[in-house]
Amino acid sequence: HSFHKLYPGIVIEVLQGTYDDVVYWIKNGVVDMGFLSASSAGDLSIVPLYKDPLLCVMPQNMERHGDGEYIGIDEMKTYPFVAQRESTDADIQNFLKGSALDVHAKYHVVDDLAMVSMVAHGFGICIMPEMVMKDIPYEVKCYPIKPEAYRIVGLATQNSEFMAPAVSTMYQYIIEHYKQKDEVDV
């Protein structure tokens, strides 16, 4: 909204898709830039913007086997899981593999809202990025994960040096206004 006020002559079209969709769109010139997880960017140029913690999401009324404000891998292993399809969120899949958290989910979904709705209705727990959970309309509990798990969200382009002037203007605006104040490294 603030960009449009400063540059009313620049028309912006927003597309939503999976990480794979966004990579494909950038590489094939469908879009000029896109927001991606750094782990999904492949050979695209990416500027890290935000370190987004992963959270364990539980039904509001589920009794925990552990206690405290955090949840560990060993405790997560004791609950049923609602999982995203592998192509949906690479960071969560990488976390599961890296933590030896062998998830035998009975439910596999693509949509974030559908997954959190299933958790809210008692089908199990899930792992979601904090940014996704900020405006979720379901009553669930969210716990930070120990050891810390996160994704790095960045602004990806085919080549940040060769952009149309309007694209370059928006690219620089996003970096200047939305990059997390703390250093975010890939």
What kind of region is each of these model predictions?
Residues I26-K27, M76, S117-F123, L155:
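Hydrophobic residues within well-ordered alpha-helices
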Residues S45-L55, C126, E130, Y138-I152:
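Short beta-strand->loop
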Residues Q60, C142-V184:
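A late-sequence structural motif
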Residues L6-V14, K97-K106, V140:
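A local structural motif
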Residues H65-G66, I71, Y79-L101, M163-Y171, ...:
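Secondary-structure junction motif
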Residues V31, S37-L44, D112-V140:
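A ligand-binding cleft/hinge motif common to bilobed small-molecule-binding domains
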Residues H1-A41, V109:
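Central regulatory/effector-binding core of bacterial HTH transcription factors
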Residues L44-F81, P165:
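Flexible hinge/capping segments at coil-to-helix
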